[in-house]
Design a protein with these regions (language model features):
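Structural motif
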Residues: 72, 79, 104, 112-114
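Surface-exposed loop/turn positions
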Residues: 60, 95, 103, 111-113
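Double-stranded beta-helix
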Residues: 110-155
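A short, N-terminal "cap"/entry segment at the start of jelly-roll beta-barrel domains
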Residues: 1-53, 141-155
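Conserved short histidine dyad/triad with adjacent acidic residue
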Residues: 47-68
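Short acidic-glycine-tyrosine-enriched beta hairpin
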Residues: 84-106
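Glycine- and acidic-residue-biased ligand/ion/polar-headgroup-sensing regions
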Residues: 67-86
Length: 155
């Protein structure tokens, strides 16, 4: 990654945080209970993997969690667009891709979508697994270490 890309990443993170905060102020985002009803998640643990199968209804705008580890994802049904620091990506099922450490996306769901992620973990509970794979914010040591490595590689 170049230093310019790192700056772009920081700007995207800042704008995404502002979007989330402004959305909370005007009650744009769903509360956790409603979100679980609208976006049910099927959780599976097997062979050192935590698999999350998420349903996302048409016309939903969502901001993903911040990822602390690399993982594959699969779009099994539907279509969506997401925005990250690299720009817009339009996806139609079937599709698979990779999520990198520090990724957070703004997503718009065009059609009812089934989104699956697979995470390597020795966790046996949802709470423990999520604490290992998702960061509360970009100040998480795993995320900042990734950014520091980018800086070191460009100096």
């Amino acid at each position: 990654q170049s230093l310019a890309k790192l700056e772009n990443k920081k700007e995207f993170r800042k704008k995404t945080k502002e979007l989330c905060e402004e959305g909370k102020e005007i009650n744009f985002w769903y509360d956790e209970e409603t979100l679980q009803e609208i976006n049910p998640v099927k959780h599976t643990f097997i062979g050192g993997c935590y698999i999350r199968e998420l349903f996302m209804p048409k016309d939903q705008l969502a901001v993903t969690k911040i990822h602390k580890q690399d993982n594959p994802f699969f779009i099994m049904k539907g279509s969506l667009s997401f925005l990250n620091e690299d720009g817009w990506l339009h996806i139609k099922a079937p599709y698979h891709g990779l999520t990198k450490v520090g990724t957070q996306r703004i997503m718009y769901i065009h059609e009812d979508t089934v989104f699956i992620t697979v995470h390597s973990t020795d966790s046996k509970t949802i709470k423990d697994a999520e604490s290992k794979i998702f960061a509360e914010d970009f100040n998480d040591p795993v995320i900042t270490e990734e950014d520091l490595n980018t800086l070191k590689n460009n100096i």
